[in-house]
Each structure stands twice: as structure tokens, then as C-alpha cells.
Regions:
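Transmembrane-helix motifs of polytopic, lipid-linked glycan transferases
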Residues: 96-121, 294-297
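Transmembrane signal-anchor helices characteristic of membrane glycosylation enzymes that use polyprenol
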Residues: 19-48, 216-232, 319
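Short hydrophobic/aromatic helix or loop-helix immediately within or flanking a transmembrane segment
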Residues: 52-56, 60-96, 100
Length: 530
């Protein structure tokens, strides 16, 4: 019987890359269109607008570096936003930039990753790539784009494109602390791999100059990143205070990170963000995290280089969470991103027998179920993304944009405004593109400076506003993010996903002598109601 298989030709060999490109283009296009909908319904919150305000008020990169000295973040994302802010004064431009980065990440996964098409679709539309690191404009997306680009370029063995790899690692180091941790783990993985094979060491010796330049570039990027993340002496936060504030989470709180990252399904409520269905059951999440950890280790236990990457990266993330900063889901999510990177890189390595018989046996027995377990995790991520996107479609992430639009509609945007708490009201200042008075720190500003000046005692906000109105003979608008029952608000904006960005507005008017109109009728003030 003759085989029906077609003979392999150059045309057939080229059809598969073409099909891959078309699939990647279609998947990326769908991602882009759906993400546009997400962004159109996303009101930016303070952590997004803080960077924009810094860039808007900086006349040079040197001034930007000075203003952001309290932020504790490297500057790659800030420099990108600064370049965009030279072209537009609308913060939506930053969202467009972030959308471009998220879309490029989706394309890298869709085109270059070794996963089957179904898994690619689930990865791209998972919680972190579709919502957390796409709809919300922060520096995390840049680090993840560079991580997956590293995976796309990486090849096992000594003949690597070290120059390109180190560029991605350096950009990761300059993105945020979590990307820096993963970049260090990837660099150590390359060293670990080289130590395992004699031919790798010989090849590296022949390219010693190129390798030395790559090492110097990466270490320089790490040094600059750490230098910029170091808080000034007058900062209102430091690593030691973070340690004492968050160490109480204990072992269970730290281990729960794995469950939160791998199964980020939130509570179906309007304040879903950073929540989990098992929230409040920390010990249960810790136990499930240990189970997930053991199973995930078995995924890589027969691929030693990838296992080294996974254990070193995950161990560093857990230590950072336990000893430095407990963080939120957006930080914990890097554990799952690391898992995806290890799954990607693991496709390139042949399996090797593990020396511990019990672990080897468990890995062999798990092998037939790996794809189904991986699909289950990816499906859970998509469910989380769907819940988040549906709620965010109906509920404003922050009330800052609505409050800002209200002030413009009532022609109150140019009034003297007192805002507290500064970190919450800074979102309104960002949307209004103007400075307001922050009692915390006793200064005018749009962004927040996290220095110790803002921690000094202050007088009650409404009393301060009344004194200001009397002294300056000028009406004062007070914006609080916590209702003051002693005063009557002229408007309130409640129900945001970020609960601390609900707002209450109070108008403090100067006392004017009572007058009558020529007709003898009392003058009625203009209504401020909606």
C-alpha cells in the first residue's frame, strides 16, 4: 500500500513557519482588540498616574531622576513614559504605550513559544498577560516582554547569542525589582549550564572577550538598578521598616504566594483586585501552595538546568516576599511568569535521569498528566482574567476620572484644592494635570513625594480649609478619600475597585455679608448638584 504522505519539499517546509506567523498575527490581533476594550474602560489609579505626573513635570531626564528618587523603582519604564510625554499631555498616551508593550508580549508568545496553539491562546488570555500586566499601566509589562524575548532567543548549549541575551537581561534589571530577581536567576542558569558540560567551558573560553563584555554590561545594569532603588535617608520608607511591617505574615503568608499566583481567581465582588477565592484562609492557601510547589518541581526535575532556574528564581521571590516586602498579587504573579518561562525553556532540553529514585519515580508517573495539569492551570488563569475584565467593564477601577470630569463640568477645576490622603487624591491631580495642596508634607504638588516630611502631625483638614478660606478670602475645595461626618459634602464618588480611591468633596466658602437683590429677594447660591 502506498503512503499518502506528501514528500517533503522546500515549499512544504516553508508552509509551517507561514502558518505559525498567520496564527500569531490573528491571535495578537484579537488580543489587541479585546485589550483596547479593557483599556477604554479602565480609569487609571495613583500608581499609574504617579509616573505620568513625574514625567509631565520634568523638564529633563536629570530632573526626572531627582523627582523619582523616593519611588524605589528603576527607570526604564519612566524613561519610556518621559519620551511619550514630550509628544502628548494626555495620560492616555501612556496607556497606548503600555498597550503596545503588552501586544508585543502576546506576539512573542504566539509566534516564538514552543507551546501548542491551545496553550498559547490560554497563556495570552490568562489573568496576568491579559489583565494585570496589560490593562494596568505599570513597569511590570516591560520586564515580562524582555523575559519572554529572552526565552525566544535562548538556545541550550554554548553557542548562544550572548549579546542579545544580555540586552534583555539588562532591560529586565532596569524594569523593576521582580524582573531583576528573575534576570539574576537567568544569568545564574547560564553559568550553571556552562559548568555542567566540558564543551561549554571550552567554547566560553574561546569567546572570553565577548562573554566578559556581556557580564560587565549586565552587572553594570544590576548596579545602576540597585542604586536607583535605594531610598534616600529622608524617605518615609526603607527596607528595614518594610521588614518589620511585613515579617508578621509568617511562613503561611509567604507560601500562599504560590497559590495566589498560580490560581488567581478573585472573589466575584466589585473590589476583586488582588483578592482570592480562598482569601482569609491563609493556612489552606499555604498547604495548597506546597502541593503546587511539589508538583511544579516534578515538571522540571529531569531537566536540571531548568530546575535550577525554577528553584533559584522562586526561592528568591519567596525570600524577598518574606524578608523585604509582602506585596500584592501584581508582585506575586512573577512566580507564575517564572513557571511559564521554565515550561518554555524546558521544551529545548532533553530529559535526564534524576539521581534520587523517589523523585525520579514520581516525575515519571506524573509525565502522562503534565499537559492536562498545565491546561488546568492555564484555564484557571483565563477564568480569573474573564472575571476581572467583566467586573472592570462595569465598575470604575478608580473614581478619579469621574471626579475630575465632575469638577470640569462645574468649572471648579481651577479652585484652590486641598486633598487628603495625598496618595489617593494624587490621581485626581493627575487627571486635572495641575497641582493641589497636600497637608501631608505641607506643599503643593500633583505627584507624591514619599519623604518623612509627609509623616509629620497635621491639623484637621476641614479646619485647615476654613482657616485658608478666611485668610485668603477665597473659596476652598476639599477632597478626601474618607468621609468626614462632621461636614456636608457637595458630591461623593464611591464604589471603585480600588476602595481607597473613593472621593468626598466639600466646599468651604468665605463668609460674605448678607445682601439682597434690588427686588428684595434673597440671592440663592448656584446649585452644585449633578
Amino acid at each position: 500500500m502506498k503512503s499518502s504522505a506528501m514528500p517533503e519539499t522546500d515549499e512544504n517546509r516553508g508552509s509551517e513557519p507561514m502558518a505559525t506567523r498567520w496564527f500569531a498575527a490573528r491571535l495578537t490581533s484579537v488580543f489587541f482588540l479585546l485589550e483596547v476594550i479593557n483599556i477604554l474602560h479602565h480609569a487609571m489609579w495613583r500608581d499609574e498616574l504617579q509616573v505620568w505626573s513625574f514625567c509631565e513635570h520634568s523638564h529633563s531626564l536629570r530632573e526626572l531622576l531627582y523627582l523619582t528618587r523616593y519611588e524605589g523603582h528603576p527607570h526604564a519604564w519612566q524613561f519610556l513614559v518621559y519620551s511619550i510625554s514630550r509628544l502628548s499631555s494626555n495620560p492616555v498616551a501612556m496607556q497606548v504605550l503600555h498597550l503596545a508593550i503588552a501586544t508585543m508580549t502576546a506576539y512573542v508568545v504566539a509566534h516564538y513559544s514552543p507551546f501548542p496553539r491551545l496553550q498559547k491562546v490560554l497563556i495570552v488570555f490568562g489573568y496576568f498577560l491579559f489583565y494585570e500586566y496589560a490593562a494596568i499601566s505599570r513597569d511590570y509589562a516591560l520586564g515580562i516582554l524582555c523575559l519572554f524575548s529572552f526565552c525566544a532567543v535562548f538556545r541550550p548549549g554554548p553557542q548562544k547569542r550572548y549579546g542579545l541575551l544580555v540586552i534583555f537581561l539588562a532591560l529586565m534589571a532596569e524594569s523593576n525589582i521582580y524582573a531583576l530577581i528573575l534576570a539574576l536567576s537567568l544569568a545564574l542558569m547560564i553559568v550553571f549550564e556552562a559548568l555542567q558540560a566540558h564543551e561549554s567551558r571550552q567554547y566560553l573560553f574561546l569567546r572570553a572577550r565577548e562573554i566578559a563584555c556581556a557580564v560587565i554590561l549586565f552587572l553594570t545594569a544590576v548596579f545602576i538598578s540597585l542604586l536607583h532603588m535605594r531610598p534616600p535617608t529622608d524617605a518615609s520608607w526603607n527596607f528595614r521598616s518594610n521588614f518589620t511591617a511585613h515579617i508578621h505574615t509568617g511562613f503561611s503568608g509567604t507560601m500562599a504566594m504560590i497559590w495566589r499566583a498560580f490560581v488567581p481567581i478573585p472573589r466575584p465582588s466589585h473590589q476583586f483586585w488582588s483578592s482570592n477565592l480562598l482569601g482569609g484562609h491563609t493556612r489552606l492557601m499555604a498547604l495548597l501552595s506546597i502541593l503546587l510547589l511539589c508538583i511544579s518541581i516534578l515538571f522540571f526535575i529531569r531537566k536540571r538546568t531548568v530546575l535550577f532556574l525554577y528553584l533559584s528564581g522562586l526561592g528568591a521571590l519567596l525570600l524577598f516576599k518574606h524578608l523585604v516586602y509582602a506585596g500584592y498579587l501584581r508582585h506575586d504573579g512573577h512566580a507564575f511568569i517564572l513557571f511559564l518561562a521554565c515550561m518554555w525553556l524546558g521544551k529545548s532540553y532533553p530529559e535526564q535521569r534524576f539521581p534520587l529514585r523517589m523523585a525520579e519515580t514520581a516525575a515519571v508517573q506524573l509525565r502522562p498528566y503534565q499537559d492536562r495539569l498545565f491546561l488546568g492551570l492555564l484555564a484557571g488563569q483565563v477564568i480569573a482574567a474573564l472575571i476581572a475584565s467583566v467586573i472592570a467593564f462595569k465598575v470604575p477601577f478608580s473614581e478619579a476620572k469621574v471626579a475630575s470630569d465632575f469638577l470640569r463640568s462645574k468649572r471648579m477645576e481651577n479652585m484652590f484644592i486641598i486633598g487628603d490622603a495625598d496618595f489617593a487624591v494624587s490621581s485626581i491631580a493627575g487627571y486635572l494635570n495641575r497641582e493641589i495642596y497636600y497637608p501631608r508634607g505641607d506643599r503643593m504638588g500633583s505627584y507624591v513625594l514619599w519623604d518623612n516630611k509627609r509623616t509629620r502631625p497635621q491639623e484637621p483638614i476641614l479646619e485647615l480649609a476654613r482657616r485658608r478660606a478666611a485668610d485668603q478670602h477665597q473659596d476652598v475645595l476639599v477632597i478626601l478619600n474618607v468621609r468626614d461626618p462632621s461636614a456636608h459634602e457637595i458630591a461623593s464618588f464611591q464604589g471603585s475597585i480600588v476602595g481607597s480611591e473613593d472621593y468626598y468633596l466639600y466646599l468651604i466658602q468665605t463668609e460674605k455679608p448678607k445682601t439682597s437683590s434690588s427686588s428684595g429677594r434673597p440671592i440663592v447660591p448656584l446649585s452644585l448638584g449633578p
